């Protein structure tokens, strides 16, 4: 089946669009990437998304208008790749996350992904699966991260323990134990590790007065000096790093509010030192999760997402994990930039074939769930 996957991460850089040929379901799952592109949002739409994600209040009318605008952008992105690479049988659309509130104090969590699935189905004329998080949330799960079940079948190993580390706006991991004993599937874990590119990108925007949206090649951060005392304070005073999994987070915690809370301390540093320290914090937050909550350090970390292009961040990860091999998912057959969109395509394919897409041991849900609402074309 040819399936098109759509997703935009918390950084809202653009819409990742992947077309994949998918066969099989779990142990026999086969995915061949046929096309991939990231299509940028119109600047005004991206600004609106980031405002909402930062807590800017909207009326119901404004929120629904934004939902429709994002759906239009997603549908147009899908049509662009279909025109270039041929028809597809199914679309999976994760949408644009603007708020995520996981389970707290026994109350069900909730998560808002904009990008109206029914509108995508009608505009493209293709059955569309969207709203992938709600079924897991309704079962008391975190609803995130949504991809570990896909990682399990595409990136596991018979000979080594692996972590798949996505570094998007937020970081998330999938722990994949060696597949050489009967219970390995039940030991797969996954959760959000904390900040990915979010704090760095926002700091670059602020320090450049809006001229830059990110630190290309981490050249700016690499010239700075790390304030280890400040970095250690962030790790020690943030209770998210003491919270055991299953857990999930978002820009609500690691966005503008974080930078504003620590503005006095950051402003005492040069711009380069701020970026170097935020880079160290991002790397340390990932390693903190490994050391505190994994059964053992992985033999290999497979990195994907935009953070793979941040060489300074990868150097800091390697410095803090000297015995661990760090590679890219590209090296093991899964395109590192398309991986999240591929995973959404697989989740949609599973939903269409009534295959559960969550892992209760990962999210904390009370049972397996069919992920996504199906909107048939008319």
UniProtKB/Swiss-Prot annotation:
The keyword Flavoprotein is assigned to this record: no
Listed InterPro entries: Anhydro_N_Ac-Mur_kinase, ATPase_NBD
SUPFAM superfamilies referenced in this protein's UniProt entry, alphabetically: Actin-like ATPase domain
The reaction(s) this protein catalyses: 1,6-anhydro-N-acetyl-beta-muramate + ATP + H2O = N-acetyl-D-muramate 6-phosphate + ADP + H(+)
Keywords: ATP-binding, Carbohydrate metabolism, Kinase, Nucleotide-binding, Transferase
Family, per entry: Belongs to the anhydro-N-acetylmuramic acid kinase family.
Keyword Kinase: yes
Record function comment: Catalyzes the specific phosphorylation of 1,6-anhydro-N-acetylmuramic acid (anhMurNAc) with the simultaneous cleavage of the 1,6-anhydro ring, generating MurNAc-6-P. Is required for the utilization of anhMurNAc either imported from the medium or derived from its own cell wall murein, and thus plays a role in cell wall recycling.
Protein name: Anhydro-N-acetylmuramic acid kinase
Pfam families to which the protein is assigned, alphabetical: AnmK
EC code: 2.7.1.170
Gene from which this protein is expressed: anmK
Spans through the membrane: none
Single GO term (MF): kinase activity
Organism annotation: Synechococcus sp. (strain ATCC 27144 / PCC 6301 / SAUG 1402/1) (Anacystis nidulans)
One BP annotation, GO: 1,6-anhydro-N-acetyl-beta-muramic acid catabolic process
Alphabetical list of CDD domains matching this protein: ASKHA_NBD_ANMK
Xref: HAMAP family: AnhMurNAc_kinase (MF_01270)
Binding site for ATP: 9-16
Domain of life: Bacteria
Recorded metabolic or biological pathway in which this protein acts: Amino-sugar metabolism; 1,6-anhydro-N-acetylmuramate degradation; Cell wall biogenesis; peptidoglycan recycling
Coiled-coil ranges per UniProt: none
């Amino acid at each position: 089946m040819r399936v098109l996957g759509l997703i935009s991460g918390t950084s809202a850089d653009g819409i990742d669009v992947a077309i994949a040929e998918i066969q099989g379901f779990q142990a026999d799952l086969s995915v061949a990437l046929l096309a991939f592109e990231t299509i940028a949002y119109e600047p005004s739409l991206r600004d609106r998304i980031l405002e909402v994600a930062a807590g800017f209040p909207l009326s119901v009318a404004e929120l629904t208008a934004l939902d429709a605008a994002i759906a239009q952008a997603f549908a147009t992105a899908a049509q662009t790749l279909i025109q270039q690479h041929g028809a597809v049988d199914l679309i999976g659309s994760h949408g644009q996350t603007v708020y995520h509130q996981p389970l707290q104090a026994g109350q069900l969590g909730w998560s808002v992904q904009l990008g109206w699935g029914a509108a995508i189905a009608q505009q493209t004329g293709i059955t569309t699966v969207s709203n992938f998080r709600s079924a897991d949330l309704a079962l008391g799960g975190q609803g995130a991260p949504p991809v570990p079940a896909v990682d399990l079948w595409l990136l596991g190993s018979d000979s080594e323990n692996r972590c798949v580390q996505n570094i998007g706006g937020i970081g998330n991991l999938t722990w994949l134990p060696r597949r050489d004993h009967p219970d390995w599937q039940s030991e797969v874990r996954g959760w959000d590790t904390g900040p990915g590119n979010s704090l760095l990108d926002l700091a670059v925007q602020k320090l450049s007065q809006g001229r830059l949206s990110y630190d290309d090649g981490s050249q700016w951060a690499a010239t700075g000096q790390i304030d280890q005392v400040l970095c250690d304070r962030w790790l020690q005073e943030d209770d998210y790093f003491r919270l055991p999994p299953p857990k999930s987070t978002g820009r609500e915690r690691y966005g503008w509010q974080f930078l504003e809370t620590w503005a006095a301390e950051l402003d005492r540093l040069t711009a380069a030192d701020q970026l170097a320290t935020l880079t160290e914090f991002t790397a340390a937050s990932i390693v903190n999760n490994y050391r505190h909550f994994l059964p053992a350090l992985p033999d290999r970390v497979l990195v994907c997402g935009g953070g793979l292009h941040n060489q300074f961040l990868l150097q800091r990860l390697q410095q803090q994990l000297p015995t661990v091999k760090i590679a890219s998912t590209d090296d093991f057959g899964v395109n590192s930039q398309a991986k999240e969109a591929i995973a959404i395509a697989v989740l949609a394919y599973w939903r269409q074939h009534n295959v559960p897409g969550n892992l209760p041991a990962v999210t904390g849900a009370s049972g397996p769930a069919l992920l996504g609402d199906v909107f048939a074309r008319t």
